[in-house]
Every structure is written in structure tokens, then in C-alpha cells.
């Protein structure tokens, strides 16, 4: 287990002290880490000044609860920053991860703040699914004594923009809650909106919440576990790419790469279940094509975050070029008065369809216009890092991190196009080349604390990545618990990712069972959800034996189909109706026995 400092905080340790602390705690169990935390707290509080302080009972200080519901870490960072702002204002605040929130307590909340992102087709983040389901159930209590505010993060390139935040906001009001502030829906470039909203929240709460004594101004909850690393999304580690290996066959329709990155002596730590954030640069050839289509030269000066840069450099390093959005299409149409695009303006569905099927460079190619450099920059969104599920355990690979990358490649009317980050890693970073990375910790996708607990892993395609990390960790720990893998892809001969490794784990007895679904090797398509139904009786036995279930991969189709198959298995072999099966699976989620890493 690792410990986590809010990204905005400055570590009070020098690199040598940090390395010693990490070395001393790297092999401790969660229970041992909790004891060590208490031990150091006790040492600190043996100081005379501390002994003299007598804090008032917490029960006398009804305060503010912040619920963080994050998928990629952005919502968590906003929640942590708000927590810090409220502490600075001497307000009593508790910050809790949505997955750890005892949602039956919600009726007793007086001041409630929800910071949430949205995933998939307007769904809440994985860690907030149980809370969301509870609030929308008949069990949800009235909240007449609760004042609340919601900050929602989303991406306007998706149809259900900020839907999770809209859901929480409307439901809390419907249950009788009082809005402290109107909901804020923030797009990808959320920082300015978040900063303004945080200031408004602090002002609104100062008049409602009691000021806490210094000893009471503390935040609790899983969000506040400390991950000791000086590296973050905003301060990434410059690492080097050491291995770039294609692991699909020459006749495969997919290009999947096994990527290994050398972390050197950085001390960067991660756990199985975490994600690797990768900052990439756009393809110079794509930048050149876009610039020339707009009759620009590329050396025009533009302003980016207060700095003056040549247009080419700004486009390569700072702006999103490979993902189009409805807003970009609409703004480009209005700006250029394009006869092709103007009819789409005002029709959300048509704009979204066009954006989803037409990259920015092809939009310009099909509807040419002349823009000045600043107008182009103002049209685009800032470049954001991509997250990849980590496919390794440091118990085996030490100062390396591995990821499994499905390279996005497609044609648009004869022009080859590719994904920004995936093609950067696959095509443009040379061996030993620099890659800027950071760890996005995911405490909602963790191996069981008890090594004897059985594990069921469901991961078709590149969803196999975290389970490679899981197996490395289980093997290194010599964990006696059983392990069962469900994997699927189009063809056995071309698409069996990490085949030799899985076969070795089976031979060594580490992988107890493996079920494989090859969707294109026979007339009828077979998927992992079909294998789940086929093995329903045994699956139910494992669940009854306390197994933890993990799902990784596509959120929109696979994860939903897998969940439906699990519900059917639970209903059939558990003798339950549909409603009871759904309740059973929800309880597994609350108990952290059903965890998903979907995207």
C-alpha cells in the first residue's frame, strides 16, 4: 500500500528522506501502515504544547462533508483543493471518497458538497455507482435539513456532458435539500471554473458552518491517504521508454503494444490497479498538415498560458488535435461561415455525429478557410494526458512500469489517421526516448487484503493489462488464493495477449482457471459474457467462497454486457429474482468485492 499527498501540497521531506520513508514502508500491509500512522501521531502529540491542547468533542462541531467521485483523478484534485481552502478558512471539513462514504449517513448531513466526474454514457464514476443507485432508490431519505452544492466535471465532446453531476444535483434537490449554489458544469479545461467555484463555496459556508479550533480542522476519509511522490499530473517524471513490442500477430486487425518505461532512480511507486498518466506530443506531420490547410506558416507567435510560442510548437505540445468536439465544429462553422457546416449549427445530435467521425484536420480539409493563428488556438482545447491501466507489479519489475496500448489507427477518405497518445508511444518515441509520466492512483481497483481470497478477473482486449499486474503481485506474494481469468479477443492465433505468460501461470498453479472467448474463430461470435454464463454454476460457487470480481475494459458495451451476465448468474444459481440479484451485486460493490476499471 502507498500513502497520498494532495497534488497541490509541497512535501516537507527532501528526496533522501522520502526515499528512506518509502524503503521502510514499501512491504507493509494496510494494517501495519495504519499502526505506523497512529504511532507517529502519538509521537507528535507527546509534545508539551500538544498535550496542553484540549480539543472540543467532534460531536459538538457539525461540519462540512465533501464527497469526491472521481474517475481519472480530476474530481479528486478539485475536492482536495476545496478541502484545503476550507481548512484555511478554519472550517470543520471532512473529505471522503464516494466509495468509502456510508451513504445511509446522508440524512444527517447538514452541509454537503459533491464533486463528481462522469464516465461512459452519462454514468457516475465507478466509486460513486453505489451512492448514485442508493439516492435513486426507494430507500433514499428526505434531506430537508441538508444544504448542498455540486461541481460536475465532464467533456463536452461526449453526448451526456456532466450527466452524473446533473443527476446528483437534481436528486438532492428532489429529496428536499437546499442548494447553496447553482451546479457548475465544467469542461476539460476546468481549472478556472473550479477555482472560482471554490471561492464561492468558501464564502457561502463561512456564514453557515462553525469555525473549528486548529486541532479540529482536519479532514478524514480514504481520499486523504498519502501517496508519497514528488511527481504528479502537473509535475510529471521524465522517464525513458525501454521496450516497445507489438504483441498481436502480423495478420491481426489490431495493433497492440507492450510498452516498458524505465523509472530510473526516481523512487516513483505504484500498486497493481493504478494507472499511468502519459503526456504526449502531437505528430509533427499532423501539425504541418493542419497549418498548411489554413494557409499559415507555423512560425506565427501565439500566447499559451502567458507565454509566447511559435504556432507549430504550441500545436505540438499544448493543444488537442486528435479529438474533435461538437463545440469545435459549431465554433468553426460560425467563424468561417462554412456552407457545409452551418446547417449543423443548433442540431446537437448532428454536431456530435460529425465530430465523432471527422477529425479536426479533416474538418478543415473538407471545409477550408483562412484563420489567423490566435483564432485557431482559441478554437482548440488544451492537450490532456492519457491514462493507461498499469500492466506490471513493482514486486517483479522494480523500477519499471509496463502498459498495454491499443494503437488507434483508421482512415478518413484515404488519409491515415491515428490516436494522439497511442501513436506517440508506438511510432514516435525512440528506444531510450523521453516520456513524461505520472501515477494516477486508483484505490477502487485493488487486490484483496487477504491473500487467501479468490480472485475473478474479466478483461477482454487491452482490459487484460491490470490482471497481468495482479498475477505478478499474487505470484510474488505466494498468495494461496485461487485466481480465475476470463479473456477474449477476435482470434486465438493473432490476438492472445501475453499468451506465454498466462500458460506459465497455469503450469505453475498460480492461475487456477482460464476461460477464453475468441469472437471470430467460429461462425457464432463468442464473448467473455458468454463464458460467464457457461460457467455460471462454478462462478456462483466462487462468489459464495468470498471471491472478489474485477472487470476491466470498454465501458459502453463490454462492461454492461458482463454486468448483465453476472446478474443472470446470481439470479439463476442464487435463486433470486431480478431485483434481489441487483441488490446482491450492489452489496458486493459496497463491500469492494465487485470492482471495475472501465473506460
UniProtKB/Swiss-Prot annotation:
This protein's record includes keyword Oxidoreductase: yes
PROSITE patterns in UniProt: FAD_FR, FLAVODOXIN_LIKE
Cofactor(s) in the UniProt record: FAD; FMN
Start and end residues of each Flavodoxin-like domain: 64-202
GO CC terms, sorted: cytosol
SUPFAM superfamilies: Ferredoxin reductase-like, C-terminal NADP-linked domain, Flavoproteins, Riboflavin synthase domain-like
Transmembrane intervals: none
Enzyme Commission designation: 1.8.1.2
First-level EC class: oxidoreductase
UniProt pathway: Sulfur metabolism; hydrogen sulfide biosynthesis; hydrogen sulfide from sulfite (NADPH route): step 1/1
Signal peptide range in chain numbering: none
Annotated GO MF terms: flavin adenine dinucleotide binding; FMN binding; sulfite reductase (NADPH) activity
Reaction(s) the record says it catalyses: hydrogen sulfide + 3 NADP(+) + 3 H2O = sulfite + 3 NADPH + 4 H(+)
GO biological process, one term: cysteine biosynthetic process
Gene3D superfamilies: 3.40.50.360, NADPH-cytochrome p450 Reductase, Chain A, domain 3 (1.20.990.10), Nucleotide-binding domain of ferredoxin-NADP reductase (FNR) module (3.40.50.80), Translation factors (2.40.30.10)
Residues that bind FMN: 70-75, 117-120, 153-162
Binding site for FAD: 322, 356, 386-389, 404-406, 410, 419-422, 599
Domain FAD-binding FR-type intervals: 234-448
Keywords assigned: Amino-acid biosynthesis, Cysteine biosynthesis, Electron transport, FAD, Flavoprotein, FMN, NADP, Oxidoreductase, Transport
Similarity section: Belongs to the NADPH-dependent sulphite reductase flavoprotein subunit CysJ family. In the N-terminal section; belongs to the flavodoxin family.
HAMAP family the UniProt entry points to: CysJ (MF_01541)
Protein name as annotated: Sulfite reductase [NADPH] flavoprotein alpha-component
Name of the gene: cysJ
Amino acid at each position: 500500500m502507498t500513502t497520498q499527498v494532495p497534488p497541490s501540497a509541497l512535501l516537507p521531506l527532501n528526496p533522501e528522506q522520502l526515499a528512506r520513508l518509502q524503503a521502510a514502508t514499501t512491504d507493509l500491509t494496510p494494517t501495519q501502515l495504519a499502526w505506523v500512522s497512529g504511532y507517529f501521531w502519538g509521537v507528535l502529540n507527546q509534545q508539551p504544547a500538544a498535550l496542553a491542547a484540549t480539543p472540543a468533542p467532534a460531536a459538538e462541531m457539525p461540519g462540512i462533508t465533501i464527497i469526491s467521485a472521481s474517475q481519472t483523478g480530476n474530481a479528486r484534485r478539485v475536492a482536495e483543493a476545496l478541502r484545503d481552502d476550507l481548512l484555511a478558512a478554519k472550517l470543520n471539513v471532512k473529505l471522503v471518497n464516494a466509495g468509502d462514504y456510508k451513504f445511509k449517513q446522508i440524512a444527517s448531513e447538514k452541509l454537503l458538497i459533491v464533486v463528481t466526474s462522469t464516465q461512459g454514457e452519462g454514468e457516475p464514476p465507478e466509486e460513486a455507482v453505489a451512492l448514485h443507485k442508493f439516492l435513486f432508490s426507494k430507500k433514499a431519505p428526505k434531506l430537508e435539513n441538508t444544504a448542498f452544492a455540486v461541481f460536475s466535471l465532464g467533456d463536452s465532446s461526449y453526448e451526456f456532458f456532466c450527466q452524473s453531476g446533473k443527476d446528483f444535483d437534481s436528486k438532492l434537490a428532489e429529496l428536499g435539500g437546499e442548494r447553496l449554489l447553482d451546479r457548475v458544469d465544467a469542461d476539460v479545461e476546468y481549472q478556472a471554473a473550479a477555482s472560482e467555484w471554490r471561492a464561492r463555496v468558501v464564502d457561502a459556508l463561512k456564514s453557515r458552518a462553525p469555525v473549528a479550533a486548529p486541532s479540529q480542522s482536519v479532514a478524514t476519509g480514504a481520499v486523504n491517504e498519502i501517496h508519497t511522490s514528488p511527481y504528479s499530473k502537473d509535475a510529471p517524471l521524465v522517464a525513458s521508454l525501454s521496450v516497445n513490442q507489438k504483441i498481436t500477430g502480423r495478420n491481426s486487425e489490431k495493433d497492440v503494444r507492450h510498452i516498458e518505461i524505465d523509472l530510473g532512480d526516481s523512487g516513483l511507486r505504484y500498486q497493481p490497479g493504478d494507472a499511468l498518466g502519459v503526456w504526449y506530443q502531437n505528430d509533427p506531420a499532423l501539425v504541418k498538415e493542419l497549418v498548411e490547410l489554413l494557409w499559415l506558416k507555423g512560425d506565427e507567435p501565439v500566447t499559451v498560458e502567458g507565454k509566447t510560442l511559435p504556432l507549430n510548437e504550441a500545436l505540438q505540445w499544448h493543444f488537442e488535435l486528435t479529438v474533435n468536439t461538437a463545440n469545435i465544429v459549431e465554433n468553426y462553422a460560425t467563424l468561417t461561415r462554412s456552407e457545409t457546416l452551418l446547417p449543423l449549427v443548433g442540431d446537437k445530435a448532428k454536431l456530435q455525429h460529425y465530430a465523432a467521425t471527422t477529425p479536426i484536420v479533416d474538418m478543415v480539409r473538407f471545409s477550408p478557410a483562412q484563420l489567423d493563428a490566435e483564432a485557431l488556438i482559441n478554437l482548440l482545447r488544451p492537450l490532456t494526458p492519457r491514462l493507461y491501466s498499469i500492466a506490471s507489479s513493482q514486486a517483479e519489475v522494480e523500477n519499471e512500469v509496463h502498459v498495454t496500448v491499443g494503437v488507434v489507427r483508421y482512415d478518413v477518405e484515404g488519409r491515415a489517421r491515428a490516436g494522439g497518445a497511442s501513436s506517440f508511444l508506438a511510432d514516435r518515441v525512440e528506444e531510450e526516448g523521453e516520456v513524461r509520466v505520472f501515477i494516477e492512483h486508483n484505490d477502487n481497483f485493488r487486490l484483496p487484503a487477504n491473500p487467501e481470497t479468490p480472485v475473478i478477473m474479466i478483461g477482454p482486449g487491452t482490459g487484460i493489462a491490470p490482471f497481468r499486474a495482479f498475477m505478478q503481485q499474487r505470484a510474488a506474494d505466494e498468495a494461496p488464493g485461487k485466481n480465475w481469468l476470463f479473456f477474449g479477443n477476435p482470434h486465438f492465433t493473432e490476438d492472445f495477449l501475453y499468451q506465454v505468460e498466462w500458460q506459465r501461470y497455469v503450469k505453475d498453479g498460480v492461475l487456477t482457471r482460464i476461460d477464453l472467448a475468441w469472437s471470430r474463430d467460429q461462425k457464432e461470435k463468442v464473448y467473455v459474457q458468454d463464458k460467464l454464463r457457461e460457467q455460471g454454476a462454478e462462478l456462483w460457487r466462487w462468489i459464495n467462497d468470498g471471491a472478489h470480481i474485477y472487470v476491466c475494459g470498454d465501458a459502453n458495451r463490454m462492461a454492461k454486457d458482463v454486468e448483465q451476465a453476472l446478474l443472470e448468474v446470481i439470479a439463476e444459481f442464487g435463486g433470486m429474482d431480478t431485483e434481489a440479484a441487483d441488490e446482491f451485486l450492489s452489496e458486493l460493490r459496497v463491500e469492494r468485492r465487485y470492482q471495475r476499471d472501465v473506460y
